[in-house]
């Protein structure tokens, strides 16, 4: 068994959260299903991996995720209920127990989505993002893997934004401790690659890339080498979406993928309104 694979079944963390089972393991944390003994509600308990306990940047990202998300309350943002340190000095987060799939896993299975479904997912993500930005926070790592699709009573799943580990205050530094641009290059806005301070419109570019991918089956820019991908974000025009797709949706994608923030939507609410109007034309 590795140093990170400790059987924690039955452990009570923070005198309140009794671990039931290991349900996932990411690059930074182990995720457990746990029972909140105070409310009798199941939650997800994320504990930083022991192998990262001596990594300052990993601990900073993990703690930032908790601090940022704990302040945000919206149905399209995964809730963080509590943060703390175990008796063994391990940082942990208590978060909403999500039972759905990521948009990434759905796209792997289905390749592309219907215009109505893609528009709904993007609209919901923008609803959550508006609250994030109103709080003065930028997500900085929006991508299909960070959009959870949760079962809901209606025909379309609930979208929940997750993973705020790279989030920062608007106008704050744009680099990690190692001095490199953070986030996933496939979804990153050109101004961040130019070394400019991002704002909320940088996140809108990422939503534009995701919407393009949902409608076409692939992101607008792909390359085998990082420098080629960077140059494409900076200089290349995105390929045209299929002409059979609704014109209103194609226009929204083009607007969101503008190379300069001033040419995009003013904020998440404005882009959401455009999507809402476009949805009225969809069959």
Spans of model-derived segments:
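C-terminal lobe helix-coil module of Hanks-type protein kinase domains
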Residues: 186-283
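Protein kinase catalytic-loop region centered on the HRD/HxD motif
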Residues: 126-137
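Activation segment signature within eukaryotic-like protein kinase domains
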Residues: 121-122
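A short, aromatic-enriched beta-strand patch in the conserved N-lobe beta-sheet
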Residues: 82-84
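AlphaC helix of the eukaryotic protein kinase fold
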Residues: 49-71
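Protein kinase glycine-rich loop
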Residues: 20-26, 31
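Conserved short submotifs of the Hanks-type protein kinase catalytic core
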Residues: 88-102, 106
